[in-house]
């Protein structure tokens, strides 16, 4: 089918005038074209008919009004054919589209709205059309990519199925066609880039006759939509695009030939960035009062009462209610604290009113009691003295701290005590009251009744330190949560037990032990260190050793409290007087000391004290194991005590013929040692048990560090480290507050616990080393009771002044000189004797 679309030369004059057809409808043409524009479909054509699409796609974000749409339509597309030919073309296109298969590419859909068919007449290309605007809203706002024109483009469309076209009658009724006769003055666009390949013909530039185009007015719904979109655009702030208007990702850079295909990636609206989200929009939106009460009920502000939204608008009566009786305003507090000053006249009137009270006359405010009204008239109150004159004998200082020694004060205090007991009941602390009973039948030191139970372990004192309810709480049952008890039983460690979290799942008794039981060794670490024999192992004998230690401690305490010397204690134990203590005598002594020992414990005690294993406890063993020999020193007469021989037993005739042994000393001379090196006090040597002899070869680190007695002093060799007391540097005269260095002039913990007599009297080190004159030194010696003649004082002063390079004398120098002179006199007296 060969069809030439265009205007013949004969028809130009008929169409010269511009005609406007209002309400003219071409059912076949408009229906097909509007329907194709709405459904985004394209009609197929025959190979003879060619389409030349020269349309430019408008940007999706730009929406033009009606006038701009018509102008752009004229510039974009031109229709160069008559109305009747268009009608016939529409019929042909419909028939051609119906004959094709129903399948088109998405990119080809809707091309009919933006492209026009251009006929070829014997290889002559007709002049490009002027333009057309479609009245469909979808056609105006849709984005379509232009297709390539020419033979290739036409051939590709032949045989392809066409999209099913459903013309809409509503859009046909609303659309309006305007036929315009183009004027020769209208200038065509110089260059329009539509993205399609255009065929260039030699006769294309020759055909410059103006053609008539068909303009289809857009429907009214498009104008309403554009008005709403303008309103929405006005509400959005400047610089931010609405989120529903998304531009292509290639806009401005590339030409999207397939805009209907989804683009890869996520397109973020332009303008919604982090800075925009973090920027507060002011002024803020105001919540309506109707919704505010619900918000305040659910989220009340800080410090505001939560009010139910049902009574949010109720009248507020409670804040203005007043309960009780309204009190009247009294005098203000500032008036009471700082009253207004009164005048002199008002003060005199006030004093006159107050003078009638007895308290004002006896104890007036701010002055003493005026006794003149009660005295006889004419008495000289200034020179008259009442009472008896007191003779001044002693000052309060002498009464509190008399200038006497302690012995004199104590002796004077005891004088007349018996008289004060009768007159004033002045008893000493703990002194019993003497009721003066008949001494023939009663002795004041006698004790009657049952002895009070007494325990040395302090159980009675421990009981008295607790309140009764505390003791009852200890004896009472303690309630513990079963959940907490189960948790502690399962997860907390217990002393002497291995942690077993799965113990509850094991069906074994609590005392079950897995694995082979190891037999404990007979010896311990201490036995290995001291190299003890098997019969002397101490492992497993802790209870036995503890009992023996307790018995020995009790006997030591009794001996120390009851006897003054070791010899007196030994004679108390030695009932037979043979210088030895046997087991029976030890049993009797323990009974007298309120110690009831069984035979086994007595044997263990006796074996412990009997070092030489002779069956008796001698004086040396008694002093080492049953006494505190360091506190009960040896007297001189104890060294000369002689042991008498034992008398023979007359029952045994063999012992009767034995001669009596020679008399020996109770203490051997080699058993007597000095208590300390250089001391005159003597004590007995320390006995070592056979198992303890090995310990002499072992020395601890602390004993080696502290064993400096008699060694080279530390001043003879350098010492590393900084000393605790910095005696190596002089103390500053004025010390800083932050200086915590001990220069040796400060007291130690011992001086705080046991202060000297000087510290008790408030005399410190600086007072001893302060330089003083001769008169001040003489006065100090006289006040402390040191009586020296003038010659002796001069001698002491001269010796003390020689100890300083500048001849200065202090109290410490005088004290040292007096000690030296006294020591020299003592030595002189001993030499003369």
UniProtKB/Swiss-Prot annotation:
Residues 561-596, 597-632 form the EF-hand domain. Expressed in airway epithelial cells. SMART domains: EFh. GO terms for biological process: calcium ion transport; flagellated sperm motility; negative regulation of protein binding; regulation of calcineurin-NFAT signaling cascade; regulation of store-operated calcium entry. It is found in: Cytoplasm, Cytoskeleton, Cilium axoneme; Cytoplasm, Cytoskeleton, Flagellum axoneme; Cytoplasm. It comes from the Eukaryota. Ca(2+) 2 binds at residues 610, 612, 614, 621. GO terms for molecular function: calcium ion binding; calcium ion sensor activity. InterPro entries: EF-hand-dom_pair, EF_Hand_1_Ca_BS, EF_hand_dom, EFHC1/EFHC2/EFHB. PANTHER family: EF-HAND DOMAIN C-TERMINAL CONTAINING PROTEIN, EF-HAND DOMAIN-CONTAINING FAMILY MEMBER B. Microtubule inner protein component of sperm flagellar doublet microtubules. Interacts with STIM1 and ORAI1; the interactions take place upon Ca(2+)-store depletion and dissociate through a Ca(2+)-dependent mechanism. Interaction with STIM1 inhibits STIM1 interaction with SARAF. Microtubule inner protein (MIP) part of the dynein-decorated doublet microtubules (DMTs) in cilia axoneme, which is required for motile cilia beating. Cytosolic sensor for calcium, modulates the interaction of STIM1 and ORAI1 upon store depletion and the activation of store-operated Ca(2+) entry (SOCE) and NFAT translocation from cytosol to nucleus. This is EF-hand domain-containing family member B. It comes from Homo sapiens.
